[in-house]
Amino acid sequence: MKKGLLFILLAAASVCLPAQEKENAAKSYTVETNRFGANWFISGGIGAQMYFGDNDGKADFGKRLAPALDIAVGKWFTPGIGLRLAYNGLQAKGAAPSADARYAKGGTYSNGYYKQKWNMANFHGDVLLNLSNMLCGYNEDRIYSFIPYVGAGLAVSWSEPREKNLGINAGLINRFRLSPALDLNVELRGLLMKNAFGGASKEGMGGVTVGVTYKFKKRGWNAVPTVPMVPESQLNDM
């Protein structure tokens, strides 16, 4: 856990290095907190996801990949901290030893295990941390931003038998600036559940999606110059 956190911090800090000299020469400033209606965004992405649970190793890697869809709406409250409500899901695939298992579709793999397939959704809320802005300072023209997140929500299956379970979410958004209004996102995400779909004591879902984010107006942050403090003794001498 500590090694993983250290890796994230080092990776985020590394994106600051090329612009460090430029930022050191820039005028010192802070940013104003905008109104509640500012810095809202909507994002969407498509990709692939994989279920991890009982007998998941009984199917080949490619056979376990399922289509994935991401949709999210959120707001940045500061350049470094944001919240979002998100949907992830579409479909999941697995393997079962019996034709009577949940979501078994009748067909079999070459090893005799039955194919599983079900429609699912994961509704969750996340806390977003833009480490590029937090560690390197706010820069509205930054091309790449490193944004890990963590959250919780409810995972459900739309296929019979319908199941639902609380889940913990975590992931990483690699954000590439396309324009003041649009970003390209490459998102790596994970979901951890307890005995939700396949009967395992712990189950999970991992996915990778590519998509875009549209940022509504008013977007960005207003810079406020930082006024240096002058000691009272110097003021008296003036």
State the predicted function of each range.
Residues 1-33, 219-238:
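Cleavable N-terminal export/targeting peptides
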Residues 20-74:
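Short glycine/proline- and aromatic-enriched beta-strand/turn motifs that initiate or cap beta-hairpins
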Residues 28-39, 80, 133-146, 178-181, ...:
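Short loop/turn motifs that connect adjacent beta-strands in outer-membrane beta-barrel proteins
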Residues 38, 63-67, 119-123, 144, ...:
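Residues that define the transmembrane beta-barrel architecture of outer-membrane proteins
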Residues 44-48, 71-75, 125-131, 150-154, ...:
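Residues on the lipid-exposed face of transmembrane beta-strands in outer-membrane beta-barrel proteins
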Residues 54-60, 95-102, 139-141, 159-168, ...:
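Outer-membrane beta-barrel translocator domains and adjoining extracellular loop/strand segments
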Residues 79-166:
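Gram-negative (and chloroplast) outer-membrane scaffold detector with strong preference
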Residues 94-99, 177-238:
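Predominantly the C-terminal beta-signal and adjacent terminal strand-loop region
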